[in-house]
């Protein structure tokens, strides 16, 4: 059984069973890490939304906005962390306060008040935090930073995301990017050692919900062993 075939079948299962809501993105939102996975860089640039499955999600982002001052100033907020549950929500948007002046920017950096608004127009219940500089000093990547953050007892820690291995993501400008999140209970499988193929299959199997796992097992039993 080829890994590509099985991975493709799992991806199809996920596309129908897991993706349940859309995180709307605006130009001033610089998405850095989603559910422990790196999202920054040119691969994400231009995407206007991010598809997430039903369950808990954690995002690390910055607000970057050119201020209409003379001369022009590019405001950049500290890294912000927010955790929310996407259950029974079709879309989520990050609602920022007005940031048009340096004073607005300083105020937001000091006290970053923002909301996550669901498709019903009401704010979601969230946990939020600001990533402090001491978290950044000893880490080489943002994935490493968030893994260390998530094993600690902080306001927006999600221990399940500390064990997720990194994976590449891509986006086409103006389109969406599918991303898996956490469904409770969450299980993880580390990818290491010689039998990476088997462990990768285990990892993706454990990310699926129980119904998807049952469907996959039924399908797998019908496949010939080569």
Curated annotation (Swiss-Prot):
Protein name: UPF0319 protein YPO1442/y2728/YP_1333
Residues spanning the signal sequence: 1-20
Species of origin: Yersinia pestis
Residues forming coiled coils: none
Disulfide bonds: none
Similarity comment text for this entry: Belongs to the UPF0319 family.
InterPro entries the UniProt entry points to: UPF0319
UniProtKB keywords: Signal
Pfam families found in the cross-reference section: DUF2057
């Amino acid at each position: 059984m080829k890994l590509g075939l099985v991975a493709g079948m799992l991806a199809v299962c996920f596309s129908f069973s897991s993706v349940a809501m859309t995180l709307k993105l605006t130009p001033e939102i610089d998405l850095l890490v989603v559910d422990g996975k790196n999202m920054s860089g040119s691969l994400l640039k231009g995407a206007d939304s991010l598809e997430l499955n039903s369950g808990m999600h954690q995002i690390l982002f910055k607000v970057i906005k050119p201020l209409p001052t003379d001369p022009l100033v590019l405001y950049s907020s500290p890294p912000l962390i927010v955790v929310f549950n996407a259950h029974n929500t079709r879309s989520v948007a990050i609602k920022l306060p007005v940031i048009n002046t340096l004073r607005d920017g300083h105020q937001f950096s000091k006290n970053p008040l923002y909301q996550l608004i669901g498709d019903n127009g009401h704010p979601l219940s969230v946990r939020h935090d600001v990533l402090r500089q001491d978290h950044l000093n000893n880490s080489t990547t943002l994935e490493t930073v968030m893994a260390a953050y998530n094993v600690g007892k902080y306001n927006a820690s999600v221990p399940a995301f500390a064990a997720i291995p990194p994976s590449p993501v891509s986006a086409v400008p103006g389109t969406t990017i599918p991303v898996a999140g956490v469904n409770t209970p969450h299980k993880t499988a580390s990818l290491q050692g010689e039998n990476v193929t088997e462990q990768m299959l285990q990892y993706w199997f454990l990310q699926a919900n129980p119904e998807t796992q049952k469907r996959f097992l039924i399908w797998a039993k019908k496949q010939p062993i080569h």
